[in-house]
Amino acid sequence: MTTIELRQLLLDDLGEIEEIERRSYPTPWSRSMFVGELAKPSSICLGAFEAEGEDGALVGYLIVSRYVDAWHVMNVAVDPDHRGRGVATMLLERLFDLTADDARRGYTLEVRVSNEKAIDLYERLGFRSRGLRRGYYTDNREDALIMCKDPVTLA
């Protein structure tokens, strides 16, 4: 089994990010969208890489923006050849670890209503459906399910 290492994404990773994005989504983000998120101090941009003993390739990534009241998951993608191996779970769990001191914000995301595997993953990690954004996706006007993970209540 492949060993995965998580680290902050860098501008040097853009080529691999874009390749995974193109292989994952019908309407991929532009390079400028990735550059903008990578440059924002309020963003968390994590990459999952094969361990150095292997080829060190990027196999997945997570991009999150800090909003006033929530951490918003902007983009999660895993290379199709590495799906089903827990990469997205590792990335999201690292997000929760990194934001533990600020978890009162909670977490939000949108996901295609047809993406049952992603919805199942998010539910396993504590996200719950909070509504729909009708016609959200521009490629086919598919609805997005709005999901939220409530802030951690500190005793």
Q: How would you name each of these model-derived features?
A:
Residues G60, G86-A88, N115, G126:
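Conserved phosphate-binding and hydrolysis motifs of nucleotide-dependent enzymes
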Residues L58, S129-G131:
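Residue-level detector of beta-propeller blades
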Residues L109-I119, Y136-R141:
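Conserved beta-strand-loop-alpha-helix junction that forms the acyl-donor binding cleft
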Residues T99-E110, R133:
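Conserved GNAT acetyl-CoA-binding A-motif
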Residues E5-R85, L92-D102, D150-L154:
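Acetyl-CoA-dependent GNAT
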Residues Y122, F127, M147:
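Conserved active-site tyrosine of GNAT-family acetyltransferases
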Residues N75-A77, T108-E110, I146:
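Short aromatic/hydrophobic contact patches that present stacked aromatics
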Residues D139-A155:
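Terminal substrate-recognition subdomain of acyl/acetyltransferases
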